[in-house]
């Protein structure tokens, strides 16, 4: 992990205990409870720090997740849909988050709008199985990716704020 602020944020996210994925039936239900508790705590901490930046929800089985994330740049809010599926080998394998509307707009993305997390995030995830969960994926995966990529895409004129597009 990079800086002290990141360490502090991550230290406030509850770690998970149940090593289970979607194939594990009853244990998966327990893991999902832990995932939700961890996500709720992370969102509450973000709101308390005036750093609210995403919403997530899942299907009934907890295997498909979707929502919105946003990034504030020059006092303008850029909002994006996000989605991911829980891999069958979860938690050993981290989910791959997709930001479909940015598909093909940056080199740090795979087909289908899946963001590239291989160099920095996936080794960290692998060292922390099963303690890391979806809140950690957001805090250490999507959050830093947005912080680097969105300003760059704005500067290059690849994305524009919706209000600027309507003028």
Swiss-Prot record:
Entry protein name: Ubiquitin-fold modifier-conjugating enzyme 1
Positions annotated as active site in the UniProt record: 116 (glycyl thioester intermediate)
GO molecular-function terms, A-Z: UFM1 conjugating enzyme activity; UFM1 transferase activity
GO biological process assignments: brain development; protein K69-linked ufmylation; protein ufmylation; regulation of type II interferon production; response to endoplasmic reticulum stress; reticulophagy
This protein's record includes keyword Ubl conjugation: yes
SUPFAM superfamilies registered for this protein in UniProt: UBC-like
CDD domains, A to Z: UBCc_UFC1
Species per Swiss-Prot/TrEMBL record: Rattus norvegicus
One Pfam family this sequence matches: UFC1
């Amino acid at each position: 992990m990079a800086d002290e602020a990141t360490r502090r944020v991550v230290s406030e996210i509850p770690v998970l205990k149940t090593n289970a994925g979607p194939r594990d039936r009853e244990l998966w239900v327990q893991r999902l409870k832990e995932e939700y508790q961890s996500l709720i705590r992370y969102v509450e901490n973000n709101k308390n720090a005036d750093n609210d930046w995403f919403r997530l929800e899942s299907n009934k089985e907890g295997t498909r997740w979707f929502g919105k994330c946003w990034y504030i740049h020059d006092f303008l809010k850029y909002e994006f849909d996000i989605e991911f599926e829980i891999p069958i080998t979860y938690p050993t394998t981290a989910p791959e988050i997709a930001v479909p509307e940015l598909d093909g707009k940056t080199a740090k993305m795979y087909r289908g709008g899946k963001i590239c997390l291989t160099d920095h995030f996936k080794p960290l995830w692998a060292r922390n199985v099963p303690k890391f969960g979806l809140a950690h994926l957001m805090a250490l995966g999507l959050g830093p990716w947005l912080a680097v990529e969105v300003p760059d895409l704005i500067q290059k004129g690849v994305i524009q704020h919706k209000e600027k597009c309507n003028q």
